[in-house]
UniProtKB/Swiss-Prot annotation:
Note describing how the cofactor binds: Binds 1 zinc ion.
Matching PROSITE patterns: ATP_CONE
Zinc finger (unnamed): 3-34
Protein name: Transcriptional repressor NrdR
Gene encoding the protein: nrdR
GO molecular function terms attached to this record: ATP binding; DNA binding; zinc ion binding
Alphabetized NCBIfam families for the sequence: transcriptional regulator NrdR
A UniProt-annotated Pfam family: ATP-cone
Family annotation (InterPro entries): ATP-cone_dom, NrdR-like_N, RNR_NrdR-like
Length: 149
């Protein structure tokens, strides 16, 4: 690997350790020419499937869109940003684990609902009301009753 300071290729790894729950390797490197030290991170490149929309079109998975949707449902709810990030990571992991090139948007919605159900029941109902297109109060009531079981 080239040194970011002098661009020479003579670098050596002086320390390696696992980070991010074992999904990344952090390496400290030293340049053999200028003796500067720098850090690199190595992780496997795993492709997230494309999303098949309701109209049949396909679009790339958008982690920011997922995050915005979850944060919108959790607005003014007592859930830490760390818990939100862990939920997003679990959803992405499950999408990758399918091994499929394409995943239906409904499948992503179900994964989000499952995570929100664990994080915060009010946020779950908020998201479900939009995702499941509630038309009247009875649909809210039915979904709330399911949560009580």
């Amino acid at each position: 690997m080239r040194c970011p300071f002098c661009a020479m290729e003579e670098t050596k790894v002086i320390d390696s350790r696992l980070v991010s729950d074992g999904y990344q390797v952090r390496r400290r490197r030293e340049c053999g020419y200028c003796h500067e030290r720098f850090t690199t991170f190595e992780s496997a490149e795993v492709i997230v499937p494309k999303i098949i929309k309701n109209d049949g079109s396909r679009e790339p998975f958008d982690e920011d869109k997922l995050r915005r949707g979850i944060q919108h449902a959790l607005e003014k709810r007592p859930v830490s940003s760390d818990d939100v990030e862990k939920a997003i990571s679990r959803i992405i992991y499950q999408l990758r684990a399918t091994g499929e090139r394409d995943v239906k948007s409904q499948d992503v919605g179900r994964l989000v609902m499952a995570e929100l159900k664990e994080l915060d029941k009010v946020a779950y109902i908020r998201f479900a009301s939009v995702y499941l297109s509630f038309d009247d109060i009875n649909q809210f009531t039915n979904e709330i009753e399911k949560l009580k079981d």
